[in-house]
Amino acid sequence: MKKRIISLLLAAAMTFSLTACGGNSSDDKKEETKTENTENTDNKENKETPEVDTIHWGRANSGNILVTIAKQQGYFDEVGINVIEDPVESSTAALQALQAGQVDVTSNQGTNNPLQFISTGSDFSIVGGYMLKGMYIIGKKDTQYKDVTSLKGSKFAYAGVHPVVGMALLDAGIDPNNDVEWLTYSTNSDRLAAVVSGEADYAVLSGDQLYAVGNNDQIEIKAWLDDLVPNYGCCRMNMNTDFVKKNPTTVKLLLKSLIRAEQWYLANKEECVKILAKEIGAEEDYVAAYLLNDNYVSSVDPCKNSVVKTWDAMIKMGFIDQEDADKINIEDHINTELYKEALDECVAEYHDEDPDFYDGRVKFFEENDQ
């Protein structure tokens, strides 16, 4: 009974909460069929041929700037992949679509949501990432905040215990379930309003609210979640394990294109504001508020160590039933090999274009995935 109650609460929380990297739009059924590519790979340029040349990506309404850039710069075309973005209405809808094979990849559903699905039997593999960090805690300007210990005894607006905040509380010896009162609000805008009205002392918000926060003189950002749990791996890139096993070249080439897009994004952020604003139909000031923020950081890296830490913390906090966890080796659901192959090839082919970027990606992988 306890297990069923926890599962229902978690399902409700995921259904109504916005994703870590922004909300999602309406869900369209996938209509195209993947095209099996049977061309001979022994061509003049000796290019690899993807096993499947059409990828369906579950798209949140905040978009994925790396996918947009990879399309516009022709990186997907160069490796023979066509990425179709299919709108999904929520984190739960995105992961259910992935489970059903309606989409091939999702990237805007945080880390805890795909891990929750894995814990209940979904055979997903985390193969990369989108946002590394970018979420934050807000409070009224006159609310005294020193560090995570200031949250003890507070009223916190979120849909249940926030996993990253919960991890930080556990590290500080504070029981996240009993020492903080969690108030459930279904959207980021509702959580923001709860703090402004005084119903809640704090709230966790994502990048899509940075413009609103910056233009509200009653509140301020108290802490970035990365200050509490460094490199917590905000949004992971998820695929069905069976798809990854059958199409390793496709996945590697997809990651390779995204790594190149990440380099271009970091070198051209101002231009990316215009590109993404046009792509999602938003004002440039709104997009600039998060895309140009130094704390809003992308990374295609799988961040294996952070994923494992989040998994362990979710078990401690009751998000994942211990009996379910005992049946699963979470490392079997984190594929770092294909990302490493993609990164190695990028370094070999494009290192001279931006040595600092590629050296940094290699160092980051060594520190966060081994």
Language model segments and positions:
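Alpha-to-beta junction loops
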Residues: 81-84, 99-110, 120-124, 154-157, ...
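Secondary-structure end/capping motifs
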Residues: 246-325
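Bacterial lipoprotein signal-peptidase II cleavage site
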Residues: 18-39
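Ligand-binding "clamshell"
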Residues: 50, 116-127, 176, 212-226
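Short beta-strand-to-loop elements that line the ligand-binding cleft
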Residues: 82-90, 107-109, 176-187
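Conserved C-terminal helix/tail region of periplasmic/extracytoplasmic solute-binding proteins
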Residues: 316-370
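Pocket-lining segment of extracytoplasmic ligand-binding domains
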Residues: 112, 143, 182-183, 189-279
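Bilobed "Venus flytrap"/periplasmic-binding protein-like clamshell domains
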Residues: 50-74, 78, 136-140, 144, ...
